[in-house]
Amino acid sequence: MATSNSKPTQVLLATFLTFFFLLLNNVNSSDELSFTINNFVPNEADLLFQGEASVSSTGVLQLTRVENGQPQKYSVGRALYAAPVRIWDNTTGSVASFSTSFTFVVKAPNPDITSDGLAFYLAPPDSQIPSGSVSKYLGLFNNSNSDSSNQIVAVELDTYFAHSYDPWDPNYRHIGIDVNGIESIKTVQWDWINGGVAFATITYLAPNKTLIASLVYPSNQTTFSVAASVDLKEILPEWVRVGFSAATGYPTEVETHDVLSWSFTSTLEANCDAATENNVHIARYTA
């Protein structure tokens, strides 16, 4: 009579079942994207560039054009992370929470005349720079496209203010939360330091639909913070790309927009009941 040792088979089966249930739990529990870029490299494979954005030989992400160390007029550029982010789930109704941090420098030849700032933003994966989006529009909007069709949420770091020309714009440099247009829904004054390294953190708390932006200059430990209620599910498509945009303006109103480092993490918690009803699925973005 043939005999066999069943212990290895039992161990193998137990290992398989453990792996299966871990995988099943992971699919049901969250959909996550996380990355950290401590130093940019030319021709960065993980980034998509639009306009005049580029990476310098020293590993700095330059969002607008710089020639011989000098910022140039009427320049606009974007840099986005190549992999799309699933910001909400059409099947379960769940919305992602995210947090991003980055260090940056804005430097102007004349600190009394600056233009125009930079922004972190979320937009449809195929979003492109609109025409006429230099200067105050930060490469995101123009004078005729401030409506819900944009599907853009941004946090602007605005260095230019011209309240006499644009009554909606605060009469101070500011951090603003933008929804589908350049007129911010909430702002806080920002005491910009010319050439200073700033550390910014932007967080979205999905359970209470709150977008929070804060900025600190390590050199003086002054913190600026603003928050607003934003329903990403009502504004953005299911999949987005995240990144930066910046623009300069008139010949004398220029500055550099340099990003030194960047990290991002998003987690989309699944609705287990809905996932069970609709069978387990692994999400993939298709263009």
From Swiss-Prot:
Residues 1-29 form the signal peptide. Residues 279-287 form a propeptide. The keyword Protease does not apply. Pfam families: Lectin_legB (PF00139). Glycans are attached at residues 90, 142, 208, 220. Mn(2+) binds at residues 156, 158, 169, 174. Keywords: Calcium, Disulfide bond, Glycoprotein, Lectin, Manganese, Metal-binding, Signal. The glycosylation on N-90 is determined to by of the high mannose type in PubMed:26003537, while PubMed:27720757 found a paucimannose at this position. Ca(2+) binds at residues 158, 160, 166, 169. N-acetyl-alpha-neuraminyl-(2->3)-beta-D-galactosyl-(1->4)-beta-D-glucose binds at residues 74, 116, 133, 136, 160, 166, 253. InterPro entries: ConA-like_dom_sf (IPR013320), L-lectin (IPR016363), Lectin_LegA_CS (IPR000985), Lectin_legB_Mn/Ca_BS (IPR019825), Legume_lectin_dom (IPR001220), Leguminous_Lectin (IPR050258). GO terms for molecular function: carbohydrate binding; metal ion binding. Sialic acid-binding lectin recognizing oligosaccharides containing terminal sialic acid linked via alpha-2,3 bond to penultimate galactose residues. Binds the trisaccharide sequence Neu5Ac-alpha-2,3-Gal-beta-1,4-GlcNAc. Binds fetuin when fully glycosylated but not when the high mannose-type glycans are removed, although the secondary structure is virtually unaffected by deglycosylation of the high mannose-type glycans. The lectin activity may depend on the presence of a single GlcNAc attached to N-90. Homodimer; disulfide-linked. Dimer of homodimers. Belongs to the leguminous lectin family. This is Seed leukoagglutinin. The lineage of its organism: Eukaryota, Viridiplantae, Streptophyta, Embryophyta, Tracheophyta.
